[in-house]
Amino acid sequence: MLSLSKNWNALIKPNKVAYENVSETNNKAKIVVEPLERGFGLTLGNAMRRVLLSSLQGAAITSIKIPAIEHEFSAIPGVKEDVSEMILNIKGIEVKMYVAEKRIIKLKAIGPCVVTAGMIETGHDVEILNPDHVICNLAKNKQLEMELTCKVGKGYVLSTNSYADNLPIGEIAIDALFNPVKSVTYKVENTRVGQVTDYDKLIMFVETNGDLLPEMAVGLAARILQEQLQLFISFEEQEEDKQVKTDALPFSPYLLKRVDELELSVRSANCLKNDNIIYIGDLVKRTEADMLRTPNFGRKSLNEIKEILAKLNLRFGMDVPDWPPENIQELSKRYEDSDN
């Protein structure tokens, strides 16, 4: 009977996720995932992008209260912008909350001045992430006071939604963008594993408002997908599938694979064979200096193997405990069968 686990174990898996910060403020990152099966780059990239832009928790200003102002179609004496324009500007204020409960923050300004988000008194539970953001322009000897309500939520919530129904008179609901992720783009390129050059490499660019680091945002999105997809698994793993998992080894079972599975060039493969390097475990225990002392083994072959090992999250000079095991052939066959 075909092992169920072959459906997922036979697929190539990414060996790591590489994060590269691309801004001084740590809110933009380039994320590279490789290698992936053909088509998986598009599948994962699209799913991650949708979740990142729709499902993460964040904070936003949901309503404002200005003395003597009852609706957004009013004008405030001494303020260049009308209330509707101010609301548009306030929607652009990015906030971070350290508590789950709503908080009221206050703004008090005396003109002449340009009123910015940094003038808001927030207390310890709320932080303004873009303090230079302009709210309005205040004339000389004029005063502006305002209370702003901050809440935690997700997605984009219109002011017409249910939370606006219970607001007291004089408090104006505004549209709230809770999502801490500002933009997500991705592209898929080819990458190489051994002699196969058409595996997928997923490259994502994620920008947040500073509430979360991009690495954390990506991790949360992956966890959301994991929780949603878990319900689709409606079968029990077979006992033979579990056996390989429960047999404890002091090293990765991948080291039991033969080096000829790496699909090396003929020259490199012959050098390893002549030096009696049979298993990947034999290979990674060697240092680069050891390899260069191998007859007919040059720098080109070394770089070829280093590149392949790196894609598998392996390297030369690794400390592999209890290698080689006494029953290496039996173990190698067992794990080979589990993959098949």
UniProtKB/Swiss-Prot annotation:
<dbReference type="Pfam" id="PF01000">
    <property type="entry name" value="RNA_pol_A_bac"/>
</dbReference>
<keyword id="KW-0548">Nucleotidyltransferase</keyword>
<dbReference type="InterPro" id="IPR011263">
    <property type="entry name" value="DNA-dir_RNA_pol_RpoA/D/Rpb3"/>
</dbReference>
<keyword id="KW-0808">Transferase</keyword>
<feature type="region of interest" description="Alpha C-terminal domain (alpha-CTD)">
    <location>
        <begin position="251"/>
        <end position="340"/>
    </location>
</feature>
<dbReference type="Pfam" id="PF01193">
    <property type="entry name" value="RNA_pol_L"/>
</dbReference>
<dbReference type="GO" id="GO:0003677">
    <property type="term" value="F:DNA binding"/>
</dbReference>
<feature type="region of interest" description="Alpha N-terminal domain (alpha-NTD)">
    <location>
        <begin position="1"/>
        <end position="236"/>
    </location>
</feature>
<dbReference type="InterPro" id="IPR011262">
    <property type="entry name" value="DNA-dir_RNA_pol_insert"/>
</dbReference>
<dbReference type="GO" id="GO:0005737">
    <property type="term" value="C:cytoplasm"/>
</dbReference>
<dbReference type="GO" id="GO:0046983">
    <property type="term" value="F:protein dimerization activity"/>
</dbReference>
<keyword id="KW-0804">Transcription</keyword>
<dbReference type="GO" id="GO:0003899">
    <property type="term" value="F:DNA-directed RNA polymerase activity"/>
</dbReference>
<dbReference type="InterPro" id="IPR011260">
    <property type="entry name" value="RNAP_asu_C"/>
</dbReference>
<dbReference type="Pfam" id="PF03118">
    <property type="entry name" value="RNA_pol_A_CTD"/>
</dbReference>
<comment type="similarity">
    <text>Belongs to the RNA polymerase alpha chain family.</text>
</comment>
<dbReference type="GO" id="GO:0006351">
    <property type="term" value="P:DNA-templated transcription"/>
</dbReference>
<dbReference type="GO" id="GO:0000428">
    <property type="term" value="C:DNA-directed RNA polymerase complex"/>
</dbReference>
<dbReference type="InterPro" id="IPR036643">
    <property type="entry name" value="RNApol_insert_sf"/>
</dbReference>
<comment type="function">
    <text>DNA-dependent RNA polymerase catalyzes the transcription of DNA into RNA using the four ribonucleoside triphosphates as substrates.</text>
</comment>
<protein>
    <recommendedName>
        <fullName>DNA-directed RNA polymerase subunit alpha</fullName>
        <ecNumber>2.7.7.6</ecNumber>
    </recommendedName>
</protein>
<comment type="subunit">
    <text>Homodimer. The RNAP catalytic core consists of 2 alpha, 1 beta, 1 beta' and 1 omega subunit. When a sigma factor is associated with the core the holoenzyme is formed, which can initiate transcription.</text>
</comment>
<dbReference type="InterPro" id="IPR036603">
    <property type="entry name" value="RBP11-like"/>
</dbReference>
<keyword id="KW-0240">DNA-directed RNA polymerase</keyword>
<dbReference type="InterPro" id="IPR011773">
    <property type="entry name" value="DNA-dir_RpoA"/>
</dbReference>
